[in-house]
Amino acid sequence: MVKKLLYIICYIFFWADISLSLPLCTEVDVRKWTNCKGEVNTPDGTKFIGEWKEGNPNGHGNLTYPDGRKYVGEWKNGSHDGKGTFTYPDGAKYVGNWKDGKQNGEGVFSYPNGAKYIGKFKNSRQHGEGTYISKTGEKLIGLWTDDQLNGKGIFTSPNGEKYEGEFKNSRKHGKGIISYPDGKKYSGEWENGKIKSEL
């Protein structure tokens, strides 16, 4: 944890040093902006402030949309690429890795209602190992595909209830074992979140 924190601090100071050393973009033609810092405002109210290379946002920059959406982070060839934060008008937020303008790699997506997903993403979808935590503390842990938990996984509840088994579209589906706070266990088969039969 300490090493990770030190890395983040070093990264911030490193970027700040590089950013301060870049000159302001002075060319009238944006396509000629390279290795400089500049601001662009479009007629629809979109604004970008940051670093440029060969006419494209490249390095670190802030993009603000007229509807309130905002991206702050790294860019490559005009796309979100690297580490960045995207916030939405409704309060939702994604913090994590990007590739070619999409959420890819490790990240955290926070929902407006207080729920949260922590794990891997692919093409802006929850995809790979991850944990979903509801606003009331329930957890879904396992492998995700296209925003849904599929295959083997674990469900836990704040009251001590625990299910280990198969899921389909984030619902208990297939074989599984559920443990209750009083110590009782049930082994059986589920279908669309409901008990189908006892094993």
Residue ranges and their predicted role:
Residues 2-11:
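Sec-dependent signal peptide recognition
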Residues 5, 15-199:
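Glycine/tyrosine- and acidic-biased, solvent-exposed loop/turn segments at the edges of beta-strands
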